[in-house]
Amino acid sequence: MTRSLKKNPFVANHLLKKIDKLNTKAEKEIIVTWSRASTIIPTXIGHTIAIHNGKEHLPIYITBSMVGHKLGEFAPTLNFRGHAKSDNRSRR
């Protein structure tokens, strides 16, 4: 179910403050966050945000095509290593 249009998109307050502070200073720093549920808003375009995937922070550069998506969509949490090469040995 999508979020109601009557409500604003969710962005964590601490993340919004950091983005606004960097926009006023016109500096580029990596913003570290654990908030995967935050929505990407137009003021964050051009920033690099390090999103936590459960193990480490992955730096993601925000572009205009990412606006409206959640931060967690760009930091995968699972790492599929592939199926076993030869399954016949384990069946014997």
Curated annotation (Swiss-Prot):
Recorded hits in InterPro entries, A to Z, give: Ribosomal_uS19 (IPR002222), Ribosomal_uS19_bac-type (IPR005732), Ribosomal_uS19_CS (IPR020934), Ribosomal_uS19_SF (IPR023575)
Q: Name one GO cellular component term.
A: mitochondrial small ribosomal subunit
Task: Give the subcellular location.
Answer: Plastid, Chloroplast
- Major place of residence: plastid
Stored PROSITE patterns: RIBOSOMAL_S19
Q: Which Pfam families match?
A: Ribosomal_S19 (PF00203)
UniProt GO BP = ribosomal small subunit assembly; translation
Q: Which UniProt keywords apply?
A: Chloroplast, Plastid, Ribonucleoprotein, Ribosomal protein, RNA-binding, rRNA-binding
Q: Name one GO molecular function term.
A: structural constituent of ribosome
Q: Which family does it belong to?
A: Belongs to the universal ribosomal protein uS19 family.
Briefly, what is this protein's role? Protein S19 forms a complex with S13 that binds strongly to the 16S ribosomal RNA.
Which NCBIfam families does this UniProt record tie to the protein? Answer: rpsS_bact (TIGR01050)
**Cross-referenced HAMAP family:** Ribosomal_uS19
Q: What is this protein called?
A: Small ribosomal subunit protein uS19c
Q: Which organism is it from?
A: Nicotiana bigelovii (Bigelov's tobacco)
- Taxonomic lineage per UniProt? Eukaryota, Viridiplantae, Streptophyta, Embryophyta, Tracheophyta
